[in-house]
Amino acid sequence: MIAKPVFLLAFMALPALADAKPPLRDVTEIDNELYYIAIANEISDYCPSISGRRLKAINVMLGLRSKANSLGYTDREIRAYVESDAEKDRMRAKGEAYLAQQGVTYDNLDSFCVLGRKEIDRNSAIGVYLRAN
């Protein structure tokens, strides 16, 4: 007789499991786009001849919020992800690894400009958020 209540409890928990969402960091469409914006922002912060296309980035971020909402994430969950120190650290480490792979160093600010121009010329996922001054 104990098996029946346990089965019922387990069965009642199934909808909650079905509604479980992955962490936003695992939603690549959202996480990757935020990563591209972060790299572009870093380039524009350190290269005086390149500026960020901030309105475009803001518009895309609003779209990402809408996408996350449509996937069932609340504004509170989205804010927690975006403001999380752990997520900021993860994104920074990922970005610094990419910059280093591209030969960018904080000791050579022109290296940010070289990468920025390359990204703009390629019209890459990062380059679309940059503009040469």
Segments (PLM) and residue ranges:
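Short, flexible active-site loop motifs that bind/organize anionic cofactors or intermediates
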Residues: L8, A20, A68
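Residue-level recognition of alpha-helical structural elements
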Residues: I50-R53, A57, L109
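Sec-dependent N-terminal signal peptides
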Residues: K4-L14
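Immediate post-signal-peptide N-terminus of mature secreted/exported proteins
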Residues: D19-R53
